[in-house]
C-alpha cells in the first residue's frame, strides 16, 4: 500500500509540474497575442494611464503627480526632481508670417457710398490703409523655357565663320524637361513621399503633358548615379569623426524571377547628432553590412544592441554604446500588456528621471563639459536605483514574459547603457537615428518597393543627400541645382567639396527657409 501511495504522489507531483508549466506557457502566449493586437490596433503612445498611476499610490518613494507629469512629457523632458517648475508662458497670439516671403499687394477700394463725405457731400481722400496679411499660394506653374544661344560673326571677315554660345550644362543632355523639373520630381518622391505614378497623373492633369513613370524613373536613377560619389565622400566625413549613431530598416526590392515576389533588403543609416547622415543599401541584415561601412572606424558607435554591430565591426578602439530609449520602450510594452505591472511602471518612471537630467542640460544651454558635470552629479545614484530595481524584477517575473525580456535586455547591455558617464558627447538615446528612418517608413507606404537590386545604392545616395540637407537646414533644391549639372558634364575628382556639409560651409549666410 505504501508503495502505491508513493507512486501516486510521484505521479501527482509530476502532473502538478506539468500543469504549472502549462499555465506559464499560456500566460506567455496570451501576452504575445495581446502584444500583437496592441501593435496592430493599439495606440502608439508611451504615456501611462490613470489605472497604472493609481497602482503607484501604494508604491513607496513614488510620487504619483511626478510620474503623471513626466509620463505626459515623455522621455527627455525635465521632471520636478531635476528642474524647477516653469510657469506657462502667455499665448504669443497670432503667428507672424515670415519676412522672406514676397508680398503681393491687394488693394480693396471703398464702396462708392464711402467715397462721398456724409457731411458736405464732397469727395473723400485716401489717407492710408488698414493692412492685414494672409498666407496665399500659387499652384505650380509650368512653362516652356526657350534657350537661345547667341551666334556671332564678323560681317567683314566671313572666312572666320560663326561662333555660338556654349551649351548650358544639364543633368540629362537633350532631355525634354529642365533640371528644375528633374529635381522637383526627386524631391516630391523622396522628401514629400509622392510616388511617380501620382506625379505623372498630376502633370497630365495640370499641363496636358504625359510623361511616363518609366521616364521619370530614368531621371531618378540618373541623379542617383551622380550622387553615389557624393555619398561616398559623406561616408568619409562621417568616419573621420568620433561618434556615430546607427540603425537599419527593411525595404522591399522587386525581384525579376517571374514569381512576382519581393526580397526584403535593408537600408542601414549612419549619422551623427547635429550632422549629416549616410544610408547604405544591403540585400541582407547580416554583419557584413556594418562591417564594410564602418571599416576601421575609431570612436563611439551607438546602436540598439543588434548583434550585427558587434563582432568584427570597426577598428580596435571602437566603443560600443546603447540606447536608453530602446530599454525604456521594452518596459512600456510590458505595461501595455499588463496594465497592473507596477514594477515595469516604476522602471519607466526611473528612466524618465534619467532623461530629465539631459533635458535640464538642454534647457540651460550647457555645453558637453557642463552636461558631463551635471550627469556626474545626478546620474550615478539614479543608475544604482534603476539597476537594483530591475535586478529585483528579474527575480519575480517570468523570463519569457515582456517584463522578463525587458529586464534581461537592460541588464545584458548595462555597461553600454552607462557609457554616457564617461563620454559627454554621447546622447542617452539613438532617437536621432530613428528619426532619420521616418521618411523611409513614410515612403514605403507610397512607393511600395525599390525596383531592383541595382537601384538600391542609387536610392541610398539620394536618401543620404535629402535627409542630410533636412538635418543641416540646407535648401535641398538649391543644393542639387548647384552640384548636379557639374557632376553630369564634368565629373569632379574633388567630391569632398560637394557634400552637403562642405557646400553649406562655404555659404555661411545660407538661407534656412524654404528648405525643400
Language model features with spans:
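Short, flexible loop/hinge motifs at secondary-structure junctions
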Residues: 1-173, 216, 245-246, 252, ...
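Catalytic center-proximal scaffold of phosphoryl-transfer enzymes
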Residues: 6, 90, 96, 114-116, ...
Amino acid at each position: 500500500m505504501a508503495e502505491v501511495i508513493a507512486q501516486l504522489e510521484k505521479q501527482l507531483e509530476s502532473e502538478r509540474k506539468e500543469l504549472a508549466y502549462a499555465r506559464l506557457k499560456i500566460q506567455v502566449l496570451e501576452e504575445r497575442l495581446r502584444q500583437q493586437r496592441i501593435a496592430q490596433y493599439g495606440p502608439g503612445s508611451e504615456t501611462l494611464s490613470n489605472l497604472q498611476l493609481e497602482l503607484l499610490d501604494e508604491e513607496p518613494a513614488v510620487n504619483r503627480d511626478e510620474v503623471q507629469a513626466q509620463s505626459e512629457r515623455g522621455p527627455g523632458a525635465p521632471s520636478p526632481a531635476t528642474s524647477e517648475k516653469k510657469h506657462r508662458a502667455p499665448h504669443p497670439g497670432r503667428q507672424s508670417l515670415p519676412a522672406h516671403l514676397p508680398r503681393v499687394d491687394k488693394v480693396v477700394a471703398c464702396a462708392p457710398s464711402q467715397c462721398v463725405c456724409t457731411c458736405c457731400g464732397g469727395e473723400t481722400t485716401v489717407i492710408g490703409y488698414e493692412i492685414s496679411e494672409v498666407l496665399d499660394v500659387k499652384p505650380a506653374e509650368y512653362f516652356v523655357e526657350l534657350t537661345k544661344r547667341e551666334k556671332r560673326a564678323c560681317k567683314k571677315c566671313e572666312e572666320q565663320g560663326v561662333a555660338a554660345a556654349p551649351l548650358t550644362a544639364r543633368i540629362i543632355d537633350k532631355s525634354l524637361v529642365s533640371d528644375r523639373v528633374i529635381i522637383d520630381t526627386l524631391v516630391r518622391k523622396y522628401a514629400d513621399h509622392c510616388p511617380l505614378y501620382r506625379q505623372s497623373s498630376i502633370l497630365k492633369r495640370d499641363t496636358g503633358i504625359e510623361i511616363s513613370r518609366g521616364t521619370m524613373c530614368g531621371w531618378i536613377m540618373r541623379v542617383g548615379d551622380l550622387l553615389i560619389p557624393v555619398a561616398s565622400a559623406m561616408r568619409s566625413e562621417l568616419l573621420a569623426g568620433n561618434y556615430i549613431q546607427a540603425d537599419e530598416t527593411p525595404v522591399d526590392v522587386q525581384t525579376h524571377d517571374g514569381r512576382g515576389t519581393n526580397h526584403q533588403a535593408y537600408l542601414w543609416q549612419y549619422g551623427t547628432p547635429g550632422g549629416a547622415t549616410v544610408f547604405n543599401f544591403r540585400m541582407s541584415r547580416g554583419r557584413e553590412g556594418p562591417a564594410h561601412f564602418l571599416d576601421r572606424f575609431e570612436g563611439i558607435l551607438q546602436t540598439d544592441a543588434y548583434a550585427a554591430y558587434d563582432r568584427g565591426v570597426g577598428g580596435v578602439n571602437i566603443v560600443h554604446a546603447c540606447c536608453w530609449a530602446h530599454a525604456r520602450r521594452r518596459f512600456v510594452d510590458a505595461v501595455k500588456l499588463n496594465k497592473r505591472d507596477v514594477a515595469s511602471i516604476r522602471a519607466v518612471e526611473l528612466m524618465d528621471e534619467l532623461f530629465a537630467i539631459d533635458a535640464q542640460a538642454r534647457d540651460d544651454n550647457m555645453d558637453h563639459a557642463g552636461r558631463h558635470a551635471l550627469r556626474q552629479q545626478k546620474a550615478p545614484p539614479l543608475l544604482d536605483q534603476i539597476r537594483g530595481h530591475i535586478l529585483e524584477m528579474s527575480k519575480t517575473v517570468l523570463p519569457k514574459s515582456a517584463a522578463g525580456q525587458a529586464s534581461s535586455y537592460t541588464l545584458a547591455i548595462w555597461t553600454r547603457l552607462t557609457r554616457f558617464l564617461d563620454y559627454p558627447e554621447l546622447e542617452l538615446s539613438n532617437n536621432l537615428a530613428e528619426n532619420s528612418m521616418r521618411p523611409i517608413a513614410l515612403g514605403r507606404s507610397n512607393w511600395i518597393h525599390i525596383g531592383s537590386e541595382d537601384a538600391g545604392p542609387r536610392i541610398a545616395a539620394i536618401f543620404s543627400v535629402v535627409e542630410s540637407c533636412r538635418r543641416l537646414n540646407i535648401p535641398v533644391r538649391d543644393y542639387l541645382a548647384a552640384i548636379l549639372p557639374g557632376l553630369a558634364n564634368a565629373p569632379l575628382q574633388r567630391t569632398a567639396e560637394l557634400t552637403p556639409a562642405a557646400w553649406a560651409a562655404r555659404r555661411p549666410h545660407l538661407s534656412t527657409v524654404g528648405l525643400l
